[in-house]
Amino acid sequence: MDNYTSDEDIDEDFDTQLIIQQSLQDIYKPGTAQHAPKDESLHSFLSADYKKIVETIEKVGKEDALSHLTKYHSAFGEADEIGWIPLHKAAVQLNRKILEITLSASDPSLWEQTTHNGETPLFLAVSSCLLENATFLLLNGCNPNAKNFEGNSPLLAAVLRDCYDMAALLINYGADVNLRCANERTALHEAAKLGREDMVKLMLVSGAHPDPQSTYGFTPLALAAQSGHTEIMEMLLRKGKIFCLASDSSSILLEAASGGNPDAVALLLEYGADANIPKNSGHLPIHVAADRGHLLALKILIPVTDLAAIKQSGISPVHCAAAGAHPQCLELLIQAGFDVNFMLDQRINKHYDDHRKSALYFAVSNSDLSSVKLLLSAGALPNQDPVNCLQIALRMGNYELISLLLRHGANVNYFCRVNPLHFPSALQYTLKDEVMLRMLLNYGYDTERCFDCPHGDKVHPSYTVEGWTSTVIKDTKFCEVITLSWLQHLSGKVVRVMLDYVDQVRICSKLKAVLQKQGIWSEIHFILTNPRSLKHLCRLKIRKCMGRLHLRCPVFMSFLPLPNRLKAYVLYKEYDLYGQGIFTGTW
């Protein structure tokens, strides 16, 4: 090989290096080009010939002008800031003649060059649904299987654009109908998902496998079932298998249930689909239909689902309907005989921070009054969860929800499992609201425990933080809570209401010191230092003999041999603010 270099060559190299150096210096000159946008910098390196070519390509009726520019061969290889060469520009123009001129002027090595998104000229023509351009490029040997950087093929792009003729053209020129694209999906996957019936027929006739599984294990049939495309499902069912499971063991019937099309569900059952195959999470098709609120699909699935499979799953469709706030589905399930007191299995409820168990808890958490009424009327028990349903309703301050739960036996004397107080926990949510406070007290709240203090008239021990122990909040007395600096102003009103529900009580020195500063102290002092009325004492005695559960039971009260006026008195109807239509209880 001849390694000789002439002086002329050295001079040319020197000139070239000097030009490059000056260009770089201009780019990094302070306060100027270094702050220029990236696309402007790239645009400045494009030749004038390139700009002329592109301008001519993008103007209609400029074939002759473009022909005169074909002599600038190197300009046809230049790319703009998004990687488009003139051939890419020509591929998306309506004028096929422009594309022919540009292709002939471009080096064959550029015919498969990609943009920054990995798109070839053919891919762009297909995406633009330009059939003549795509035909010309295919005739000149362009690859019909060249995928872009997202992993999509020209055939898949034709399916997405719903361009049947384009898809047929690509297949005729060798496009692989079984080519795996993004997430291992084929063109048949997309056609089935989008409901392109003619495309699905074309793919199947052209040799597409009917059951390819995507990265997540979905077949075209599963995707068609999700969207409820029954005609496509029937085509695929004749060709493929119904028993393919996704990577999470989700059956095709479960996917149909999630879509909610009753015809799709019925079709799969007709072809032998099993409604008792759970996915990895344990959910069955009936669970998914109930959770999504697909009433018609649920009607079909109820008779074909085994109760043993539901029990094994650890969750009832009643839970799902309540969680999704679908009272119509809930009513259907109750009418079908599903147990409203079915409790979540431990392996399911451990995924919830509150370890909820009952369907009623889901409904209460959603403030779904319709579902709560249905469940309680069907016999749902309100005291089955680690966190009491009443506590959730009190925290939300929902009067109607609280009233519903109390009328159906919610325990007003529950204790929180974490840091329990000496008095029942429900009271802490009602200190600022007389309506809620009266509700609790009317339904048998243990008011006497609020006045239970071992220190009596003695000086109370002081803590590191006023009102709280230095370690765990446990067995904290009412006097320690209500005398906190941010609650003291409520103490008089709260204690005055409580006195309507107790016999003679003694208040400790700590509580008394705070009450004496309240404007209502004189009334409280009068009640504490005088005998209670006989009528009041009789009411307390009757309530104690009846018990809390009998007090809230309308049937029991109806059989009680007492005048209605006396029954109302026993039930504290004169203090039933919610029943009287008073819905603002803030002090």
UniProtKB/Swiss-Prot annotation:
Q: Where is the SOCS box domain?
A: 521-576
Q: Report the GO terms under cellular component.
A: cytosol
Superkingdom field = Eukaryota
Gene3D superfamilies, alphabetized: Ankyrin repeat-containing domain (1.25.40.20), SOCS box (1.10.750.20)
Metabolic or biological pathway, per its Swiss-Prot or TrEMBL entry: Protein modification; protein ubiquitination
Q: Which GO terms describe its biological process?
A: intracellular signal transduction; protein ubiquitination
Q: Which InterPro entries match?
A: Ankyrin_rpt, Ankyrin_rpt-contain_sf, SOCS_box, SOCS_box-like_dom_sf
Where is coiled-coil annotated? Answer: none
* Pfam families per UniProt: Ank_2 (PF12796), SOCS_box (PF07525)
Keywords per UniProt:
ANK repeat, Repeat
ANK repeat extents = 82-112, 117-146, 150-179, 183-212, 216-245, 248-277, 281-310, 313-342, 355-384, 385-414, 416-449
The keyword Repeat is annotated on this UniProt entry: yes
Please give the record's comment on domains: The SOCS box domain mediates the interaction with the Elongin BC complex, an adapter module in different E3 ubiquitin-protein ligase complexes.
- Provide the family line: Belongs to the ankyrin SOCS box (ASB) family.
Q: What does this protein do?
A: May be a substrate-recognition component of a SCF-like ECS (Elongin-Cullin-SOCS-box protein) E3 ubiquitin-protein ligase complex which mediates the ubiquitination and subsequent proteasomal degradation of target proteins. Plays a role in the inhibition of cardiomyocyte nuclear proliferation by mediating the ubiquitination and degradation of MAPRE2.
The UniProt subunit note reads as follows: Interacts with MAPRE2; this interaction promotes MAPRE2 degradation.
Name under which the protein is recorded: Ankyrin repeat and SOCS box protein 14
Species of origin: Homo sapiens (Human)
